[in-house]
Amino acid sequence: MTDQALQTLVEKISIVFFQKPFLHQATFNRRLKTTGGRYHLASHHLDFNPTVFLKYGQEELEKVIKHELCHYHLHLAGKGYQHKDKDFKELLAKTGGARYAPPLVERKKAVFHQYQCQSCGEVILRKRRIDTTRYVCGKCHGRLSWQAKKEQI
């Protein structure tokens, strides 16, 4: 999808769902990493993350567009346009926009180091490696031995 196609889609959604025209500029912004879109308060322009369209398709992009248009129209009307405001929540629910952007970056799985006490057999999981010559078991003060790296979700 090009910026021009995005502009026409935003204008169409604005007329159909909000019954008001979108008079500013809507573009894709590849620098957005974790958000689906952004509304600029000063210029009233909208930026959208192209990853939403590429990863989830046009249906999810339309939900993000509705979300940003809620900010846009409420701000221009002088009403509460922030996420916490009642006006915003009501308009978002009425138009069917997304409350949150879908996950755009995959989270790294946590890796833990597994240690075991040589005396009592207590298993200890740590995110950071520890020096087994300096640290001992907290339960019985026995020596620790490194077992393996474990991935946890």
From Swiss-Prot:
Domain SprT-like positions: 7-145
Subcellular location: Cytoplasm
One Pfam family from the record: SprT-like
Keyword Cytoplasm found: yes
InterPro entries to which the protein is assigned, alphabetical: SprT-like_domain, Uncharacterised_SprT-like
Broad class of where this protein is predominantly found: cytoplasm
Cofactors required: Zn(2+)
Protein name as catalogued: Protein SprT-like
Native source organism of the sequence: Enterococcus faecalis (strain ATCC 700802 / V583)
